[in-house]
Amino acid sequence: MSGNLLAKWIIGKAEKSEAYRAGTLTGMKHPKPDREMIKAAGGLPELIRQADELEKSGYIRTEKSNLGADMKKIYYSIDVIPKLCEKEGIEDPRKQQLRYIKQIEQLRAEVQGSFLEGYYDEIIRRLELGEIVKSPDMEDVDFFRCLNAVVNLKKSLWMRVFSAAVLNDSKRFKKDYEKKGDGMERSASV
């Protein structure tokens, strides 16, 4: 495995935090090494080695005992997480959330005044709260292209003609997206 596994563990903790993704988490964190952290780093000696590496780079501070053979606590500022993400080549969870919000705002602008505007408003609300939106899949750009294309239809089209026009594949809409729209109908009525 490449990279610093302790750094990835710290990033993973931030990724699970709605407050971090919403941009409201600040201050310092000071976790005690537990089984989960030790296992994630590849064992206690590896955890200590990786912590030393991050400490020398100025990302964290550690509190050790037993002449450096054991670790009591790790201290790090929330502000260091974007730097750790950059170091490890991982998209910062907060930046990802902001990217999703911008993406949905652009999609909402394309369908302003339609029934989809409320659906997009709800997704934006959830993203601003720091929620991980899994449905719809935020990375599935084609799904959103289909939604907006439906709103902009001037006349009825056969499903395959629509699929070919929007997705360049006459069977893809039926195969991948026909059922996904069901959940959207319930959200749009909220």
Residue ranges and their predicted role:
Residues M1-V190:
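Nucleic-acid enzyme cleavage-core boundary/entry regions
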